[in-house]
Every structure is written in structure tokens, then in C-alpha cells.
A protein has these predicted regions:
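Cytosolic regulatory regions built on CNB/CRP/Popeye-like sensor folds
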Residues: 1-156
Length: 156
């Protein structure tokens, strides 16, 4: 059973009231992803977002000019967010999530997640701010990769 206490271990939900967490817990279901499998792939329609319970998941993008994917971030800490595109229009995953180890995650339906955010603007804003922080960090990582690639290219 997914409990408010389990959700509270995630930075996304930490510090929120138990009654609000209980409503999110009711939406969640556990999923497993075997090592080497994709939780989702870049460009696929996004309808879910995930919270990591255990294992290791790499978030990767596949630039068309490269033959191999670039890893943006490797997630291995309880509570980390995977697949924020699942509740954010235009609802297509902007990266792939590849399980590097057998992994267990909580899955949330993106539309239902959004409805709960809208029901309580104060806590919904708190969660959205935390998600924006995740997105911002990942964009900074990608920006650093691009700049490093361009700088390296200019030296050659």
C-alpha cells in the first residue's frame, strides 16, 4: 500500500499535509522496470510521471547528430522525479528514461495529478515550484553539455 509517509520521503512531497498526501497516494501505483528496459522513450506521448523508489534510472536524450544517447542525469535516490512531461503540455516525453538497474517506481496519471494540483492552489504551487526546480536543473545540465561540445568543437 502506498502511504502518505512514503510520499513524504520524496523532495516533491516533503512537508505537505498528510491529508493532501493521502490523495496523491490514492492516485499512485507501483511499477517495476527491469535493467536495460525503457520506462519511456523520448518523443512518446507522456501520460504518467514517476517517483523513484529504488534502483537506478538514467534520463537520456538522443541528439540526431550523435550515434549514442547523452545521459542528462542518473537517478538513484528515493523520491526523485522521473518524467515530468507526463503532466505538462504538450505531453510528450522530452527524454528517455532507461533503467540501469531493476527499478521500482510510483506512477501517477498526469491528468489526475494535475487535477489535485488545481484543487489546492497553495500546495499545488509548492509542488509546481519543486518540479520547476527539477526542470531548471536538468536544463542547466543540458546547457552545460551543449556549451562543452561547442567549446570542444571550436578548439579543433
Amino acid at each position: 500500500m502506498i502511504t502518505p509517509q512514503l510520499l513524504a520521503q520524496s523532495p516533491l512531497f516533503a512537508g505537505l499535509p498528510d491529508d493532501y498526501l493521502a490523495r496523491f497516494a490514492a492516485l499512485a501505483h507501483e511499477v517495476t522496470c527491469e535493467a536495460g528496459n525503457a520506462l519511456f522513450r523520448e518523443g512518446e506521448e507522456a501520460s504518467r510521471l514517476y517517483i523513484l523508489l529504488s534502483g537506478k534510472v538514467s534520463v537520456q536524450v538522443q541528439p540526431t547528430a550523435l550515434t549514442h544517447p547523452l545521459t542528462i542525469v542518473s537517478l538513484s535516490t528515493l523520491g526523485q522525479l522521473v518524467g515530468w512531461s507526463g503532466f505538462m503540455p504538450p505531453n510528450y516525453y522530452t527524454a528517455s528514461a532507461i533503467c540501469q538497474e531493476d527499478s521500482h517506481l510510483l506512477a501517477f496519471d498526469g491528468a489526475a495529478f494535475n487535477r489535485l494540483l488545481e484543487e489546492n492552489h497553495e500546495w499545488g504551487f509548492t509542488i509546481m515550484r519543486r518540479i520547476a526546480g527539477v526542470i531548471s536543473q536538468r536544463l542547466r545540465t543540458i546547457q552545460g553539455m551543449v556549451l562543452k561540445t561547442l567549446y570542444h568543437h571550436d578548439e579543433q
